[in-house]
UniProtKB/Swiss-Prot annotation:
Assigned EC number: 1.1.1.-
Domain of life: Eukaryota
Native organism: Hericium erinaceus (Lion's mane mushroom)
Stated name of the protein: Short-chain dehydrogenase/reductase eriH
Similarity remark: Belongs to the short-chain dehydrogenases/reductases (SDR) family.
Amino acid sequence: MSAKGVAIITGAAQGIGRAIVVRLAADGFDVAVNDLPNDAQVAKLTELAEEIRATGRKAIVVPGDISQEAIVEKIVADTVEQLGGVDVMVANAGICELSPIVSTSVEQWDTTQAVNLRGVFLCFKHAGKQMLAQGRPGRLIGGGSLGGFSGLPMGSAYAASKAGMRALTHSAARELGPSGITANSYAPGIVATPLTIGNYGQEFLDSQKATCAVNDNGTPEDIAALVSFLASKESRFITGQTIMIDGGRLNI
């Protein structure tokens, strides 16, 4: 069974990232799955890769901190060596540490930018370089946030990193478009993931349903469905976009 292509997904151990891996594999992609290189996350990645292989697709585990350039270079190189190329990069990994502006430390700020903005830049840079070398169309996809549009009280560092990612996405689209490489990002609203539940609690998430036009929160699978389209050939005329997927939250 030939592959539709090869996709790298960062932040893949749980939540939205995991759902994206499952969806892209179901779409026919072979996958390289990434998350932090600690025992707990690697165990989750290994289990996920085994689940994907059981469906007939290829899957490799490429753990590492995507804020480090040498690590991202190795992730791309290992993927090319073991799976044959890179057609889709989903730079999904991100962190969110809540803190008022007046008590946010420089270290908190820098760590957030390193993962959420520099990490996406490095993924786009090295996957984009590989796509150019391959001489065929590719898809760069970033994990944004509604906070990149609206700001986020108690989350200024996070919101700023996601706003920066919007500009990065637009810039990459304009640079790489002539080579058939598109760059887009998805900006979820409230989605029930381990990260959001850990930061806000289930009671808060339940209370937010009424703030959405559809009277519900999103699921990781909702986000994965959008990524599935952005990764497809059918999305070729969409680029430079950060697409809000928020149940109408900003429109009511």
